[in-house]
Amino acid sequence: MTDLPDSTRWQLWIVAFGFFMQSLDTTIVNTALPSMAQSLGESPLHMHMVIVSYVLTVAVMLPASGWLADKVGVRNIFFTAIVLFTLGSLFCALSGTLNELLLARALQGVGGAMMVPVGRLTVMKIVPREQYMAAMTFVTLPGQVGPLLGPALGGLLVEYASWHWIFLINIPVGIIGAIATLMLMPNYTMQTRRFDLSGFLLLAVGMAVLTLALDGSKGTGLSPLAIAGLVAVGVVALVLYLLHARNNNRALFSLKLFRTRTFSLGLAGSFAGRIGSGMLPFMTPVFLQIGLGFSPFHAGLMMIPMVLGSMGMKRIVVQVVNRFGYRRVLVATTLGLSLVTMLFMTTALLGWYYVLPFVLFLQGMVNSTRFSSMNTLTLKDLPDNLASSGNSLLSMIMQLSMSIGVTIAGLLLGLFGSQHVSVDSGTTQTVFMYTWLSMAFIIALPAFIFARVPNDTHQNVAISRRKRSAQ
């Protein structure tokens, strides 16, 4: 990329900065949840909605981000994304109640939903085709550093300042990024087809109300009748979308995607698989602090081996899948992640804390292999005219399933625990033990889906071609 103009390199730095902000925010909050709960007068068992409100908003808004960028311009939308994300961070820091914090996190989610896909679109428009891969590697590298720094930085800020600072640090960075975007980024636009607003609203309503219903009386305090009403509304909305999308060439996501068997299996497996694995980044720092008494900073440091394992495995996942095939790799990693989850709880309850970093490193390796394999299996056989739509649907499902996973984890804690965590450490650890065993069971379930994947090892070279675009 050394032969690119200086203006283009600056634009790539702006996109990289956006990737870093978004990835940092997805991990920095987890370590601070117990401190937030204490400050806001809430039970730590109910703080999962701080994560869900952000991730669910990202899932809902993702389908509209690319169309908005083409219609209004990448600079205008990227600038708007940074401003909304920064304002959301400010409102998060100023929140005095859990409900205020949830609304502020949703505003952050609107910005986060536009930042990454619009950033990818910007790179496609400003970089020559032959240098696109190198440019994407450059801008996504900070996005890999974010999860590495997030948990430890969050713990450090909570322990030596307050949880408010995990949001306040975004403000000066966001202001600089917004100004740089206006000054340096070109406002590319493209001719767009008519946006499927009806389909977008039906999907948004379906996803939001079903997730809210899943949280149920334990989290939101809704009556059984209200929960039943939400379920009915959500199911009707999704059924109406299917009817709307049938034989509709302008649908948000064409039903023709599901004619490709590997896409259907991969999408179903990704949805179920990320429900289970989405619980782990939320539950691990909460358990380390509440169940084992770790400090926020110590709990944050314990998450680093998991990220390192994930980053290290990405270098060899292509060879692993090419050697053993998608079906074997996905079944093995799914069952392996379930076993590693139980191993983590066992070593923690036995007091073998020195073993935990190695277990978390192994968890990161297994999870990374499974993620990359799921992504590429889903997209590898799609025809070119459906590849973009399939990738967008996969991105939405990834965010939705993670929000559902965190919701289920919070629900399990509520079922096995009480309104407030007991001062008896033995009781608290029992609550987490039952929750962890339930999580291990849920994590193992997608193996039944992956067992139906065709044994097509000779086609697995596709992973090296599509891996980066799918992640």
Swiss-Prot record:
Transmembrane segments: 12-32, 49-69, 77-97, 102-124, 138-158, 165-185, 197-217, 225-245, 263-283, 286-306, 342-362, 396-416, 431-451
Subcellular location: Cell inner membrane
Lineage: Bacteria, Pseudomonadati, Pseudomonadota, Gammaproteobacteria, Enterobacterales
Membrane topology term: Multi-pass membrane protein
Topological domains, Periplasmic: 1-11, 70-76, 125-137, 186-196, 246-262, 307-341, 417-430
Pfam families in the cross-refs: MFS_1
Name of the protein in its database record: Putative multidrug resistance protein MdtD
UniProt entry keywords in alphabetical sequence: Cell inner membrane, Cell membrane, Membrane, Transmembrane, Transmembrane helix, Transport
InterPro entries, per database record: EmrB-like, MFS, MFS_dom, MFS_trans_sf, Multi-R_MdtD
GO cellular component: plasma membrane
Family classification: Belongs to the major facilitator superfamily. TCR/Tet family.
Keyword Iron-sulfur: no
Topological domains annotated Cytoplasmic: 33-48, 98-101, 159-164, 218-224, 284-285, 363-395, 452-471
GO molecular function list: transmembrane transporter activity
